[in-house]
Amino acid sequence: MTAQNENAQAQAEQVEVANEAQLEQTAEVQQEQPVEAELAAAYARINELETYIAEADNREKDIQLRAQAEIQNIRRRAEQDVEKAHKFALEKFSKELLTVVDNLERGLNALDTAVTDEKTQALVDGVEMTHKEFISTLAKFGVEAVGVVGEAFNPEVHEAISMQPAEGIEANHISVVLQKGYTLQGRVLRPAMVMVAG
């Protein structure tokens, strides 16, 4: 019996060793499955975070581009405002000077018919020089006269008082200038009052 007992005992040990091996193998498989699941979850989280970081980078770049564009727009508007301020700072002053020019021209027109002696002619010459210098000074600052007989009528710079037929002048052209108009850097200070050939 001893041999049978030994045999049975050996078989029992083999079964026990086999069971232990099977339990270890099952435990390893069970341990591997949660590890693989955790690893897959970790990779998914990594991908999610990388996507979030990429989106955040894109948002940041977009915000920076918009901020730079806004800064450029602000600079451009400020430069335009300064340019307009310089360009048209003289507008009100120039408008006031136009009445002086008008009066000088009226005086010259009246004196042309009244000149009878040298003293009066010297006075006329002095007023003419003053008028020319005045017009020259205005031109230096961008003030220019508009409204010349024969020029095409332009409603942006001319104000038509009436239309009448005129010999030698095409239709829709200025036939008579009642009051000169002026522009400052291309901007109308005062429209020319004119009669237009019809």
From Swiss-Prot:
InterPro entries: GrpE, GrpE_coiled_coil, GrpE_head. Keywords: Chaperone, Cytoplasm, Stress response. GO terms for biological process: protein folding. It is found in: Cytoplasm. GO terms for cellular component: cytosol. GO terms for molecular function: adenyl-nucleotide exchange factor activity; protein homodimerization activity; protein-folding chaperone binding; unfolded protein binding. The keyword Oxidoreductase does not apply. It holds the Pfam family GrpE. It comes from the Bacteria. Participates actively in the response to hyperosmotic and heat shock by preventing the aggregation of stress-denatured proteins, in association with DnaK and GrpE. It is the nucleotide exchange factor for DnaK and may function as a thermosensor. Unfolded proteins bind initially to DnaJ; upon interaction with the DnaJ-bound protein, DnaK hydrolyzes its bound ATP, resulting in the formation of a stable complex. GrpE releases ADP from DnaK; ATP binding to DnaK triggers the release of the substrate protein, thus completing the reaction cycle. Belongs to the GrpE family. NCBIfam families: PRK14140.1, PRK14150.1. Homodimer. This is Protein GrpE. It comes from Actinobacillus pleuropneumoniae serotype 3 (strain JL03).
